[in-house]
């Protein structure tokens, strides 16, 4: 029976009868609190089993599949995020490697340009030095030629002056004239010593 006899109505009321007093029958207090009565245990256990079964079915068919779906979606999202993070890390590593390679190539190119500039500067400096040296050599040769010309002129003038002076000295000392050819030969002999 689904309803315990303690809950059943004990007295029938007629339709037109009014109650003047409300009260509890004397016999209703003997049993105690209905959930604690042994006579109501089978009914309580039956409803407990039905309620637990319905709750179990509700959890099994409705709540747990939703939770499992949510967990699966979250797991898939986490896996996708991890895959995306791995791809982004690979892309970042590739970008870093490309950057480092380009940087190394730029350094090599800069070193080559600097070396080329140094070599060009050295070559230009050497060419300029050779040009200056050749200019100085030609000026030195011209100067030496002028000096030799001036020296020869001076020496020829000295020779002439020496000849004239020797002629004057001989004329004063000896009182006679000396031959110009012998004076020239004597002066040249002295100059060559």
Swiss-Prot record:
One protein family per Pfam: ATP-synt_B
Localization: Cell inner membrane
Region ranges (Disordered): 9-28
Major place of residence: membrane
A cellular component term, taken from the record's GO annotations: plasma membrane
UniProt similarity note: Belongs to the ATPase B chain family.
Alphabetized HAMAP family for the sequence: ATP_synth_b_bprime
Protein role: F(1)F(0) ATP synthase produces ATP from ADP in the presence of a proton or sodium gradient. F-type ATPases consist of two structural domains, F(1) containing the extramembraneous catalytic core and F(0) containing the membrane proton channel, linked together by a central stalk and a peripheral stalk. During catalysis, ATP synthesis in the catalytic domain of F(1) is coupled via a rotary mechanism of the central stalk subunits to proton translocation.
PANTHER family per record: ATP SYNTHASE SUBUNIT B, ATP SYNTHASE SUBUNIT B', CHLOROPLASTIC
Protein name: ATP synthase subunit b 1
Organism: Chelativorans sp. (strain BNC1)
Lineage start: Bacteria, Pseudomonadati, Pseudomonadota, Alphaproteobacteria, Hyphomicrobiales
Gene that encodes the chain: atpF1
